[in-house]
Amino acid sequence: MATPITTIKKETKTAEQIKLEKIEELKELLAENEDAVSKTMTLMNELNDLGIFDAATSMLRAKEDIAKIALGQVSREPVTNLINTMMAAGGALTKADPEFTAKLLESVMAGTEQAQSFLKEDKKVGILDLLKAMNDPDINRAVGFGLQFLKGMGKELREQ
């Protein structure tokens, strides 16, 4: 009959054995991914030749100075005004009807094209031309829209 097991010996590896195993695993990975490793090394050489690594290292060393400069630039009044204006415009745009806004922008583009062709003709517009133009349904619609736009804008300005 066999003797009972009373102790279990755990095999412990030395630091040297662990290093050798890791080196073997790394060799296997390199062999399995030879093409990817080759391309990566080529890319690294190109980046090094361009000085990207030197620039990145310099930037990392000067990160506090760069952060101070960037913060100084961002906190300038024109920049904060721009940020506040963009936030207000974004808030106003969220209230706008997307379909109407698209239609309005298409109308503006069509009007711009028509106006450019008029500028090429170099014609003068007289008072009678303006009065006749009011009979054109497209012009009348745009003028009416503009007048109502101005009225609504004026009301809002008065309330503030």
UniProtKB/Swiss-Prot annotation:
InterPro entries: DUF1641 (IPR012440). Pfam families: DUF1641. To A.fulgidus AF1717. This is Uncharacterized protein YrhD.
